[in-house]
Design a protein with these regions (language model features):
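Short, basic (Lys/Arg/His-rich) helix/loop patches that form interaction surfaces
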Residues: 45-57, 66, 101, 109-130, ...
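Short, Lys/Arg-enriched alpha-helical recognition elements, typified by the DNA-recognition helix
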Residues: 1-4, 18-20, 144
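C-terminal secondary-structure termini that scaffold catalytic or DNA-interacting sites
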Residues: 105, 109, 113-121, 126-133, ...
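Alpha-helical scaffold segments in carbohydrate-active enzymes
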Residues: 1-7, 65-69, 169-170, 209
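Basic, Lys/Arg- and aromatic-enriched nucleic-acid-binding interface segment
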Residues: 7, 11-75, 84, 94-97, ...
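Well-ordered beta-strand positions in beta-sheet-rich domains
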Residues: 87, 98-102
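Short functional hotspots where side chains directly engage DNA or cofactors
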Residues: 17-18, 85-91, 124-126, 155-158, ...
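Surface-exposed helix-capping loop/turn segments at secondary-structure junctions
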Residues: 5-14, 150, 216-224
Length: 231
């Protein structure tokens, strides 16, 4: 609630901030993440009220929706995105494998809006001055500006854990679909790596389901888990 007020300029600080980190986080997590649906809803509403640049606001909206690695999102090139087919294809920096991200309707709408100011260039999220792309610290800086602690609460990379947890535990999506969309190494029953188009219809359905779920959370709906809808 206070983060939303900060984003709207109604408050200057969060009185609960000193309590952050008082409860130890679960071990084994490399990046802090928000996985409670109610807290996710507040964060998404804060993104809508972000008073930074339009380009950074678009990055904030797309980061949780697409849950790509932060470096891959900020380095996205317009030539890799087909808005008519609703697909984003690129080479994963970590594995060097080809990857395909089905773009939900909401992502296509945001990218079409973003195309007006940045579409004439190479990068979806261009940097300022001589920088080719948006800085690697931009998303985290925006989160801190909204009142989030990027050491203990959420980081740009934490959106991946957020999506994985909620897709699995709330929406009950098949784990292999989630891992494949996270661009993790997923192998078929014969031990071979899946092609980037593997399970594409199911992944398209999952990504649209995820974007719709985030919209409902943001709107304040009491979202009921859609059991098995992308299985």
């Amino acid at each position: 609630m206070f983060r939303y007020a900060i984003a709207r300029g109604k408050a200057k600080s969060d009185p609960a901030q000193p309590l952050v980190g008082a409860i130890p986080s679960a071990k084994g997590k490399n990046f802090p993440s928000i996985t409670d649906p109610a807290s996710v809803a507040g964060m998404l509403r804060a993104f809508d009220e972000f008073h930074g640049t339009f380009i950074v606001q678009c990055a904030l909206k797309l980061a949780p929706m697409l849950f790509a690695r932060p470096g891959e999102l900020r380095k996205a090139e317009w030539s890799d995105i087909d808005l008519d087919r609703a697909e984003w294809r690129y080479v994963v920096s970590k594995t060097k494998n080809d990857h395909l991200v089905p773009l939900p309707r909401q992502a296509v709408e945001t990218l079409r809006e973003l195309h007006a100011p940045t579409g004439a260039g190479r990068y979806v999220f261009p940097g300022t001055g001589s920088a080719k792309t948006m800085s690697g610290n931009t998303i985290n800086a925006a989160l801190r500006r909204l009142g989030y602690d990027t050491k203990t609460e959420i980081t740009g990379h934490g959106f991946r854990a957020m999506a994985r947890t909620i897709l699995d535990e709330v929406l009950q999506v098949r784990p292999d679909l989630i891992e494949h969309q996270l661009a993790h190494a997923v192998k078929d029953p014969n031990g071979r790596a899946y092609h980037r188009t593997a399970h594409l219809p199911e992944r398209k359905k999952m990504m649209q389901q995820w974007a719709d779920y985030l919209d409902k959370l943001k709107a304040g709906a009491d979202v009921i888990p859609l059991h098995g809808s992308a299985a």
